[in-house]
């Protein structure tokens, strides 16, 4: 199970279950998720929305040796999305405009990892094909996109150094549910989860972690940066931030992460009702 709650009315939660199939190491899984948001970005209207989704996915080992693993990943998602604009301008307050959309999305790709002395790398490359209906001429129909993630860690005694990169490219304008977002706990942490959206984009992080002397607890310092662009706009948006945090890992059980991040160049928040100089994030989950 997973979940996220921000102090600006963005909520994401879901559950999934997976199990081994056959004898080759293949695992199949099913999942359910729901997200909602309530954003006040201007004085004319509030943006509200809700998305519910069901997913099926699989992971099949392709290659494995002592240091390398390569896995084929594939799946299907069915999503129902409802967007609302709640007008608040004089004379129009209380009026809502509603759009209901449906998406069927398929994906296939590879993920892998490599273990070397004092080094670890993890990567993925995934192709997505989807069809959206109900969103209007600019976004309805077929779309294609490619996503990739890379993590590289170097261990040096009590210290480790991490570099992480996430990239998305797409062939056309995308619905908000498929866009790439710069802000959030897995992006530029100095900005909110819906900040900086587009069809094409990247985020990059450099992080240093140091053992504190308390078992499982590390202190961290990091820099995040990213850029994003939409097909229907010439502007490229850049966001950057820096921060500090704590990481706690109990072997194969609990994981907790606390971060406080501040902006670099202090670009104003656009999707939150007030501007903030930084954000705090907390994540907790348990492995079963």
Q: Where on the chain are the PLM-derived regions?
A:
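Transmembrane beta-strand segments that form the barrel wall of outer-membrane beta-barrel proteins
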Residues: 1-7, 13-15, 30-36, 125-135, ...
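Outer-membrane beta-barrel initiation region
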Residues: 1-27, 64, 200
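Solvent-exposed loop/turn segments connecting transmembrane beta-strands
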Residues: 3-13, 49, 135-140, 196-200, ...
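Hydrophobic, lipid-facing positions within transmembrane beta-strands of outer-membrane proteins
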Residues: 11-15, 52-56, 104-110, 144-150, ...
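Transmembrane beta-strand segments of outer-membrane beta-barrel domains in Gram-negative
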Residues: 20, 25-163, 168-172
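Surface-exposed coil/turn segments at beta-strand junctions on protein surfaces, enriched
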Residues: 21, 156, 197, 249-251, ...
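Outer membrane beta-barrel transmembrane domains
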Residues: 39, 75, 79, 84-96, ...
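Outer-membrane beta-barrel "beta-signal"
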Residues: 246-256, 260, 275-288
């Amino acid at each position: 199970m997973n979940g996220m709650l921000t102090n600006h009315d963005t909520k994401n939660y879901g559950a999934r279950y997976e199990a081994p199939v056959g004898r080759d190491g293949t695992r199949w899984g099913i999942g359910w998720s729901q997200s909602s948001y309530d954003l006040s970005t201007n004085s004319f209207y509030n943006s509200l929305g809700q998305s519910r989704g069901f997913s099926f996915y699989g992971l099949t080992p392709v290659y494995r040796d002592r240091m390398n693993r390569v896995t084929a990943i594939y799946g299907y998602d069915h999503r129902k999305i409802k967007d609302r604009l709640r007008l608040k301008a004089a004379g129009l307050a209380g009026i809502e405009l509603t759009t209901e959309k449906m998406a069927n999305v398929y994906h296939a790709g590879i993920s892998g990892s490599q273990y070397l002395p004092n080094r670890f790398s993890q990567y993925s490359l995934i192709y997505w094909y989807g069809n959206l209906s109900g969103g209007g001429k600019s976004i309805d129909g077929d779309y294609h996109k490619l996503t990739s993630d890379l993590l590289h860690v170097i261990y040096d005694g009590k210290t480790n150094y991490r570099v992480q990169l996430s990239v998305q490219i797409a062939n056309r304008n995308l619905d908000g549910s498929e866009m790439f977002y710069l802000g959030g706990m897995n992006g530029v942490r100095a900005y909110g989860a819906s900040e900086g959206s587009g069809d094409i984009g990247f985020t990059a992080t450099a992080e240093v972690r140091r053992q504190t002397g308390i078992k499982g607890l590390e202190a961290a310092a990091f820099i995040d940066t990213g850029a994003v662009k939409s097909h229907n706009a010439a502007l490229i948006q850049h966001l950057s931030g820096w921060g500090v945090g704590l990481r706690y890992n109990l072997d194969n059980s609990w994981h907790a992460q606390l971060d406080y991040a501040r902006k670099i160049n202090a670009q104003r928040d656009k999707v939150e009702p007030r501007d903030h100089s930084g954000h705090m994030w907390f994540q907790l989950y348990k492995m079963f």
